[in-house]
Structure formats: structure tokens, C-alpha cells
Amino acid sequence: MGYTTVPAPTGFIAKKEMIGIPLLSQWMVQMNCLFLDRSNIKEGLKTILTGIEKVKGGISMWIFPEGTRNKTEDEMLPFKAGSLKLSEKTGCPIVPMAITNSADILENHFPKVKPTHVILQYGTPIYLDQLSADDRKTSCCLYTKYGA
């Protein structure tokens, strides 16, 4: 999705468990993906630092601030601590995005892959340096104010 909708190189931050999926994980590495160990703060910080370097090098990084795929369309889960660090440390804007119907490709009827109409909605870019200190502390408010 990222490579067909974003005009620049992109990567994703994914959970470390994705490394165990043959072929997919190899493709992800080639596509600038980083694997986040959510159970190890030190390793997680290393991943974020690598992500900062990728952004500074011109690669847009997709993050999933809720820390998991949200199966509901009606409400956001709380954002994970650190989900804004790439933007904070690089000064790059956050472009909110919603992905709808992606589970219909594979997840809802595994192992079959089904052609599906996936909807991508982009919100207004958010510049953290233009937010109040309170808004930066409560990153969930970003969805309420600027969500896709």
C-alpha cells in the first residue's frame, strides 16, 4: 500500500514477531521495515533510533501508534508511549492515515488471498512543534483533532 500511494521510499515499523514469517519478513527487510521488540525497552529504543536515521535519510516511516491492528472502525485504542518519537526527533510532520478493509485480503479467510477494495484515507499533516504542550503529552488527542 505504501509504495503505491506515497511518492517517496517508505518503510514500516512492525512488531518483532513478524520476523518469524518466512518470505514476508525477507520482503519487509528489503522494503526498509524495522522490527520493534515491544517487550524490551532497550531494543525498542535502538529500533526508534534506526527509524530516526531512516527518516533523516529521506525514507518515510509508517507507524501504528496503537501498537496493534485495531479491528474496530469506531474508536481508537490509546497510543503507545514513544509513538511520536520519530516526528519529535526529526521535525517531520505526522500524516494521519486510516486503512479500512485490509483484513479482507487475507486475515478474514486465511489461507486464501481475496481481491478486496482497501480504502486509504489521509488526514491533514500534523507538525508537533505547532501543538500545545498538553496536546503533545496526550497523543490520543491527535486522532480526535486531526484523524483521518
Where does each model-flagged region fall?
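A cross-family acyltransferase "interaction/gating" segment
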Residues: 22-26, 56-62, 71-135
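Alpha-helical structural signal in soluble globular domains
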Residues: 4-5, 86-89, 146
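Soluble extracytoplasmic domains of inner/organellar membrane proteins
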Residues: 13, 19, 36, 42-44, ...
